[in-house]
Structure formats: C-alpha cells, structure tokens
Amino acid sequence: MYKTAETVSPGHPDKIADLISDYVLTEALSNNSKSRVAVETFLTGTTYGGLVVVGGEISDIAKIDDKGIEKIVKDALAKTIKTSFEDFQLDSLKIQNELTPQSEEIRSAVEDDEDLGAGDQGIMVGYATNETQSFMPPTFDISRNIQMALWEIQNNDEKLDLDSKVQVTTGGEETKVVISTQHKKDIDIDELRTVSYTHLTLPTKLSV
C-alpha cells in the first residue's frame, strides 16, 4: 500500500487564503470576544496585480469595515509574497469585501442562554505515533520537514518565489519525493534539482 502526504509553503495560495481568514477572525475577536465568524478567502493572480475576495458571514459586533479588510489583506500578503511575484502587487491589488451579517436563522439556532452551539464549525482529529520525534505519521513528518527547509531557502534565494508544494510517497521499496516551487524564468532546471538534492533530500537520504 502506498501512502502520500503533501504540505504547502506559507507562500502557497491556499496558505495565504487561510492566513487572511485567520487575520479576520483575530481582528473580530479582538473587537468583541463574542463575535461569530465564518469567513472564506479567494485570491488569484491577474494582469492588473491580483484579486482578493473575502466573503462569508460575520457578526455585526465584530465591526470590521472595508478599510479594515483592506489592511488585513495587505498585511497578510506583505508577509507571504515577494516583490518579484508579478501576479500580486500591493499597490494595484483589487480587494473585495463580501462579508455579510450572520443569518438570523443560524444566530437564533446557536445562541442560547444555557447552551452555546458551534454552528457549522467542526474539529478535525488525527493520531499520534512514536515512529517519529514529532509524533506525527512518518509520511507527513518527512513532507513537512522538507517544506520547512525549502521555505528557508526560498526566503534567501532571489531566484525562487514562495509558492511551493512537497509531496512524499511511502510504502514501496523506497520513499519518493516530488518538490515543486515557483521561480524566476531564467533559472535552470538542473540548478533547481541541485538545490533540491543537496539541501533538501540528500540529508534525509530520500530519492528525488
């Protein structure tokens, strides 16, 4: 049986979207600890510098307006996107705030003087294992460790951008790794392979 796990860097669009949503939640709770937030973020690169749409439902008491959303989005992007990333430019980026008040049906169903409902929110559970020092499953542990090392390289190499993905497959005769990262147009594929082999997979004795 083959097992595959993948992790994405903080510069991957999925992670950036999660970060923006997390910032919205943090801001809402700081404004009022009883705020209810169900927020989703969509972003895409464009020829005019990028588009970010923040939507979902949020309590009125959270008090986050268009200017607040704009600041949240730009703060998050400033931490996760390099200036060389052509599809996103903070000075020309379009930001849409599509947050709406929480529906009365949901509010009345989850708010009670004695019982506090969770709405449609859930908690994902996993398991711990003594196979690794992190107590995470080996496939995920390897993928995450390589991604963390790659993130350090990306932040110090001007030829690399911050969007990347690492996929690790175990269960066969050998562990296999696929590393994908955005980069400048002029970088050579052999140079990328050398970086991957020397700094990422060689120390862990994995095949590329």
Could you describe each region identified by the protein language model?
Residues V37-E40, Y48-A109:
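Glycine-rich, N-terminal phosphate-binding loop and its surrounding beta-alpha-beta segment
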Residues D161-S164, G172-Y197:
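Loop-centered beta-sheet repeat module
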